[in-house]
Design a protein with these regions (language model features):
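A preference for well-ordered globular domain cores
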Residues: 1-108
Length: 108
């Protein structure tokens, strides 16, 4: 019986594999935090996840005026009329929160 030393697991390799595993766990946890993100504007609680913020950006881009209004489904699933100004503020808060989450606790 011979030993295949090419299959030996070094402490460096083990550390690299653990670092990769830690990073993958962190990414899943980070995405869960982003998916659950909510922000409040004028007493209205908006979903702040990536899909919702893309929708906000679409409405803002298509608006003629910040006073324009549209129906919006809030985080609690109530449909209300909101202004583009409110959506813009919700987008700004969501983006800032997501940016803070994005690198918080990143494994080395």
């Amino acid at each position: 019986m011979s030993i295949d030393w090419s299959q030996a697991i070094t402490s460096e390799r083990r550390a690299a594999e653990q670092a990769l595993a830690d990073y993958e766990v962190w990414k899943v946890e980070r995405q869960a935090r982003v998916d659950a993100l909510v922000v409040e504007v004028d007493g209205l609680v908006f979903d702040g996840n990536e899909i919702s913020t893309r929708r906000m950006a679409d409405v803002i881009a298509a608006a003629d005026d910040l006073a324009d209004a549209t129906e919006w489904t809030l985080a609690d699933n109530r449909v209300v009329v909101v202004t583009v100004r409110q959506l813009k503020q919700a987008l700004r808060l969501s983006t800032a929160s997501r940016t803070a989450i994005w690198n918080d606790g990143r494994p080395a």
